[in-house]
Amino acid sequence: MVHHNTQVRLNPADETIQVGVTQIRFLVTGAESNGSAAILELTIPAGARFPALPHSHEAYEETLYGLEGISTWTVDGVSIELGPGQALCIPRGAVHGFANHGAVDAKTLTTVSPAEIGPEFFREMAAVIDAAAGGPPDRSKMVEIMRRYGLTSAPPPSV
């Protein structure tokens, strides 16, 4: 039986989490969507890359829609530039990461379906990154957090 959430409101989650320099604003989480989707707004500052490790996940897809600026997504080794009005679906199992190589901030609307990941993951990752105080974050702690939330860290690139 599907539980119907009777508290219908705009941006029911409305929580912003800072992970390094990247800002993640949750608009809807699995708690508000009965697990069907999480929707978040991702803001990547100019010249920045997301501090989490490239990864994959088998439990959900990520669908991205460009709102502002251009973000660069590397999906299974292929670099894809996502701009305003463009959509990109990252399938389950695809190794991916992202950056903003541009001169202006980039913003995407991201849907995770089903909602297998939420604010808790990003809060924990932010704590590890903040603890590094500008230095490299503890990779083993990051990998452990990722594992607990169903993400598989990609091996580091060969030099």
Predicted features, each with a name:
Residues 1-14, 152, 157-159:
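Basic/polar N-terminal segments that are highly enriched at the extreme N-terminus
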Residues 23, 63, 70-72, 79, ...:
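Structural motif
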Residues 41-45, 56-74, 111-113:
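Short, conserved beta-strand element in jelly-roll/cupin
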Residues 123-159:
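Acidic/histidine-enriched, glycine/proline-rich intrinsically disordered or flexible terminal extensions
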Residues 8-10, 17, 77-95:
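Short acidic-glycine-tyrosine-enriched beta hairpin
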Residues 72, 92-119:
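Ligand-binding loop in jelly-roll beta-barrel domains
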Residues 2-5, 111, 115-134:
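A hydrophobic/aromatic-rich effector-binding and dimerization subdomain
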Residues 15-54, 60-61:
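A short glycine-rich, His/Asp/Glu-containing loop-to-beta-strand
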